[in-house]
Amino acid sequence: MIKIILSLLVLLILIAGIYIAYVYLQYNRLPDKQTLPIKKAEHSKQISANQAYKIMTFNIGYGAYPADYTFFMDGGKEVRARSKADVLANLTEDHRLLTSENPDFVNLQEVDYEGDRSFRVDQPDFFRTKNPEYNSSFANNYHSAYLFYPVTQPIGKAKSGLLTLSKGQMTQATRYSLPIETNFNKFFDLDRAFSVSEVTVDNGKKLFIYNVHLSAFIKDEVIQAAQLTKLFDNMTAHADAGDYVICGGDYNHVLSGEAHPELTWMKPFPTAKLSHKLRVVAPTNAPSVRSNGTAYGDHST
């Protein structure tokens, strides 16, 4: 009996060692300052300097979150989407919301493709096919080996990113890598980045649309600050050159109001670190930083 137990223990240690080696060998960060392909719209409209436009930013949660879904990293119970049909139903509702707003520009985050957690639905293609009137760029923001975590319901392989849509002519787009932790947490923070999509304006200037999803579940405040510094510096450079910049995304920071210190992932947005040419534009009556540890209710969450 002792030999059997020891043999099983050795086997488990061997399997764990092989898996850890696999995760380390599979890990690689995408290069910084990566040129992104642009999918052209059927027709692009001219963006004018003296006209108001609407921009929408939306973390779609890889199409997994109906109202009663709770996410394990927030203290909830679920990891993956419930089914492929559920993913498609959630994406369809997301598209309905997008269409009802009819924005000129759209920044989407957590847009999956080839992801086990979202039943490998090609979500960038879903939105591009549904919205042929938009030019688009896509930047990878997650890519990982098979993550056997949590053990009871592994998240699996993740491939996801940032999708930017523009009715104005998009001439080029670039992906910039963000600093992340270098310890074991890097396998869960995946490959943070922001994208910059360049849109032409009728006065000869350019509009740079930034799409970003900053790290959430890290405790290293130095890394959190470094991510924002790189983003701010890039935006300031274009603003100083006389061009237009706008950034929309999932900051995992409180843009207005107070942060809750008991939530380690929630930080106040460092408005004081913005250059004089940049400012925060956020509604004060609709807090957008929300925990998903409990099912959503109109008056309770």
What are these language model-derived features?
Residues 43-44, 149-154, 181-186, 294-295:
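Short, P/G- and charge-enriched loop/turn segments at secondary-structure junctions
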Residues 45-55, 64-67, 158, 162-172, ...:
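Beta-strand-turn-beta hairpins that frame and shape the catalytic cleft
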Residues 54-60, 90-120, 165, 197-199, ...:
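Active-site beta-strand/loop signature of hydrolases that rely on acidic residues for catalysis
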Residues 77-83, 111-114, 178-186, 213-222, ...:
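Surface-exposed cleft-lining segments at the edges of enzyme active sites
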Residues 135-144, 173-179:
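Conserved S-adenosyl-L-methionine
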Residues 218-301:
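Metal-dependent phosphoesterases centered on the DNase I-like endonuclease/exonuclease/phosphatase
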